[in-house]
């Protein structure tokens, strides 16, 4: 409170509508009469495959930690510039972790607030229907084409040499995809069975989170016609590699 009063805060910028990011914005806005800026259009930002899965009423799980009632005062668009007293911030739409995820680039400083799309301590959770591997790869490529060289993430320490770090995250996801494919080439598995093999000897919460990432990869591979699903698309059903 003392910091906000001293610095005369004028904008509340929210990276995405997860419960560990957006709820405090409502309280701060009320207590200090500061407007909230965010993407705010989660349903519209979902990828076409995720919209299709949701419209099919399939049991795909997900929605972990979603702040479903979050609404900003102002809705932001990709590449929009927000101007303050002595600063300007570019909005960078980066879906993948969550469809409404934004990064904020401080133009004068070449610094990017990267939210959860790039965290300082591990790769991010991608949990369908709001997490999407295809969108995630596109967002990483988008960041690689930018000039921001320092990231301030929502979790973890400041990221120096940001492009190198983002390239490392992309490489990790490609390696994970190859792991999944190598398992499916042996025989069909569901997402939980694959996660058990990849994250073996890890605590159960880690394996479950890993299974959501695996399921996101499976949906992406399915969309690309690399694999097929036995029955309806679900983390419980088996996926099989397609020999071409």
Q: Where would I find each of the regions flagged by the language model?
A:
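Aromatic/hydrophobic pocket-lining residues that form the small-molecule binding cavity
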Residues: 22, 136, 140, 214
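Metallo-beta-lactamase
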Residues: 53-55, 88-179
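Histidine-centered divalent metal-coordination motifs
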Residues: 15-21, 97, 155, 217
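Active-site HxH/HxHxD metal-binding segment of metal-dependent hydrolases
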Residues: 2-83
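Glycine-rich phosphate-binding loop signature in dinucleotide/nucleotide-binding domains
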Residues: 3-7, 83-87, 107, 145-146, ...
